[in-house]
Amino acid sequence: MAPDNMELLDYLYGASLECGIGHVDTDTTLEEILMKTIYVNATFFTMDKENQIIENGMMIVQDHTISYIGQHDEQQLADADHVVNLGGKWIMPGLVNAHSHIVMTLLRGIGDDMLLKPWLETKIWPIESQFTTEIASVSSQLGIMEMMKSGTTTFSDMFNPNGIDAGAVMETIGETGMRGAFSYTIFSLGTEKDQKANLMGAEQFSKNYKAFADGRLTTMVAPHSPYACTPEAIMESARIAKENDLMVHIHVSETDFEILDIEKRYGSRPVEHLRRLGLFDQPTVMAHGVILNDEERAILKQHDVRVAHNPISNLKLGSGIADVVSLLDAGIKVGVATDGVASNNNFDMFEEMRTAALLQKGMYKDATKFPAQTALAMATRMGAEAIGMGHTGSLEAGKKADFITIYPYNKEHLQPLSEAYSHLLYAARGNDVCDVYIDGKMVVKDGRCLTIDEEKVIAETNRLQGTLSR
C-alpha cells in the first residue's frame, strides 16, 4: 500500500552528519526498487538543454528509467511503490568521464614530471607489460570505486590488453554497477604475429561485449593513436568498427611532437592522416585534440568527430591547453575527461570541469568564456552525447536513472545556498557526493561504495603494486 504524506517520515533512512537524511533502504530488493520509486524533497539540477532547476521537486523512476521529473503530483504519490525523502539534497545527473584508463590506476604517482613520449616509453608501457589479470581487475575496481564515490556514473575507457584476460576484467567491471564503454586498445607493437593477435583480440572482444551487463556496458574500437598504430592497423580498426556498428576511441593531436612525427612519417597532420584512412567514417571520440587548426576543426565537424577534453592531464604532461571554445564554436561535441590517474592524478570530475572552465577564461583573457552551464553540461549531458550514450547525462523523462546527491547544509564552501549552480562548478568537490544511483540502483550510500569491498581493494592494491618492477 502506498504511503500518504504523513507516512513519508517512515521512509527516511541512514542519517549521517556528512550526508544528512533520506536514503532508500539498501536491503530492499532490486525488483522492488525498480517498480515505481518516487524521490521527493530535493532540488533537481536537470542539466537538460534549458538547464532547468526544480526546487522541492519530484522524480519518478521505473524500470531503470526516469518516467517523470517536475513538480509534485499527488496522484503519482498515491500510486507509488516506494517514496524516498531526500532531505533537501541537491540532485544532479551522474557525471560522465569521456576518457580514462582504469586498468592503470595502480600506476598513480609513477612517472611524475615527464613529457608524454618518455613517460609512455620508459615508465607506463614497461610496467603495464608486467600486468596480470588480477592486477588489471583490482586496479579497475579501485578506479571505478574512486569514480563512483566522486559522482561519476558513466565512463569511456581504453585498456592495454597485454597479458590479461580482458573478458574477466569486463566481468569484474560489470559487478560494480558502473555504466560505460571499456575498450581493447589496438597497438602496432612487437612482431607481425603479435600485431595480428592484437587485432584479432580486439575484434573478438568488440563482438563479445558490445552489449553487456544488462546493457550498461559496451565497448568501442580503440586504436591507440596514429603514432602507435600503422596505417594498416588504423584501416583494420575502421573495418571492425563499421562491421560491428561500434564507435571509435583514439588519442589524437595530443602534443607538438606527435604532429611533427606524423607529418614526417605520412606527409600530413594526424587528423588528415586518419581521415584519409577512413577512420572517421564511424562516429569517433578523439581524446585530447590539444593541437588543432581551423582546417582540422572543420574536418572534425564534417565527420561528427567528438572530442574528450583532458585539461589536467594535458597540463601535467606539459602537452598544452586545448582550445575548447573554438571546438564548441565549430559545433563539435566535447566532453570532459580525466585521462588515467597516472597522468592526473585523480578521477575527480568536479575538479576537472572547474579546471576546464578556468583555463579557457585565462587563455582568452575573457571571463565570459565558458560559463558554468557549459562546463557542467560537458561533464553530463554533452559528455554523454559525445561518447554515444545520450540515454544518460540529464534528468529527463526517458533517460536512465543515473544521478548523484549532495547534502550542502553542513558544507561551508557550498554556502550561500542561493548560488547553488555556481557552487557546483566553482566550489564543489568529489568528496561532497553522498549517494550515487546507476540504473536506479544505489551503488554509493553516504560516501561508501555498496558494490565493491573498499578495504579489500585498497589492501590488494598495495600488495599487488609491490610485485611490479619499476
Model-flagged regions — what are they?
Residues L106-V138, T176-G177, A181-Y184, G190-T191, ...:
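Active-site gating loops and adjacent loop-to-helix segments of metal-dependent hydrolytic enzymes
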Residues D10-L12, G20-H23, T28-L77:
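N-terminal metal-binding scaffold of metallo-dependent hydrolase/deaminase domains
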Residues R276-P283, V325-N410, A427-A428:
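His/Asp/Glu-enriched, well-ordered alpha-helical/loop segment
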